[in-house]
């Protein structure tokens, strides 16, 4: 079996309905996977039931059987029994903290390595990389480790934008990622813009959507990655 992982920048693009833009990206991963487990642990400002309901509604046209991991007495068994794994956005630190709390980090990696499809957006994409050291989120809770699922051997930065509001004097996203590359010059970071996604199929990695991505690694800063690029070389990082 090979890894089949879709890493979405966001749950929306512009003013589109929740997950609507992602349906064409998600659909190919559901061909042989009907029963999905949704992990809502990144959702801090809403109940898990409310979060689950929004995902079920957003993906309703795919007619999937989606349950929340919080509805199962044994989270590990729920992962094993599912045909696919969905992890939504929110706070990445809280998400990873809960994944460690229920001892799911290694298990999810093992299940995806065996071919179980994985779909994440925002925080759910952040945790798919080597670590969560390039998340945009506030560290509201301290997980046991920043090490993440390692579904791809590099760092991700979802919602990438280097926009700076006039008169605002805080760091831009590019400046923050530059800081990471100064500390760790050998690990690539891919900034994925809202509306786009990375899709790993075994040894192949593709950029989906109509927006470029951006690469940061060592002295390479904010290098545009053209729409439709093959990024398979990053899997050898």
Swiss-Prot record:
One of its GO terms (cellular component) is cytoplasm. The keyword Cytoplasm applies. It is found in: Cytoplasm. One of its GO terms (biological process) is proteolysis. CDD domains: GAT1_Peptidase_E (cd03146). Disulfide bonds: none annotated. Its EC number is 3.4.13.21. It catalyses: Dipeptidase E catalyzes the hydrolysis of dipeptides Asp-|-Xaa. It does not act on peptides with N-terminal Glu, Asn or Gln, nor does it cleave isoaspartyl peptides. Gene3D superfamilies: 3.40.50.880. Belongs to the peptidase S51 family. This is Peptidase E. It comes from Shewanella baltica (strain OS223). The lineage of its organism: Bacteria, Pseudomonadati, Pseudomonadota, Gammaproteobacteria, Alteromonadales. The gene is pepE.
């Amino acid at each position: 079996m090979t890894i089949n992982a879709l890493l979405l920048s966001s749950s929306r693009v512009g003013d589109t309905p929740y997950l609507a833009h992602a349906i064409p990206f998600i659909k190919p991963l559901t061909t042989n996977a009907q029963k999905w487990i949704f992990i809502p642990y990144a959702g801090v400002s809403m109940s898990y039931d409310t979060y689950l309901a929004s995902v079920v509604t957003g993906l309703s046209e795919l007619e999937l059987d989606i349950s929340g991991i919080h509805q199962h007495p044994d989270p590990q068994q729920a992962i094993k029994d599912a045909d696919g794994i969905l992890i939504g956005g929110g706070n990445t630190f809280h998400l990873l903290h809960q994944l460690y709390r229920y001892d799911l980090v290694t298990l999810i990696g093992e299940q995806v390595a065996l071919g179980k499809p994985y779909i994440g957006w925002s925080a759910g994409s952040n945790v798919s990389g080597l670590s969560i050291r390039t998340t945009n989120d506030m560290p509201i809770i301290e997980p046991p480790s920043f090490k993440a699922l390692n579904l791809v051997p590099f760092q991700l930065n979802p919602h990438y934008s280097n926009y700076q509001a006039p008169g605002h004097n805080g760091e831009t996203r590019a400046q923050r990622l530059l800081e990471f590359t100064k500390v760790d010059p050998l690990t690539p970071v891919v900034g994925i813009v809202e509306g786009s996604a990375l899709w790993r199929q075994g040894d192949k990695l593709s950029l989906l959507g109509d927006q470029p991505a951006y690469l940061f690694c060592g002295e390479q800063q904010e290098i545009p990655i053209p729409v439709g690029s093959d990024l398979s070389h990053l899997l050898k990082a």
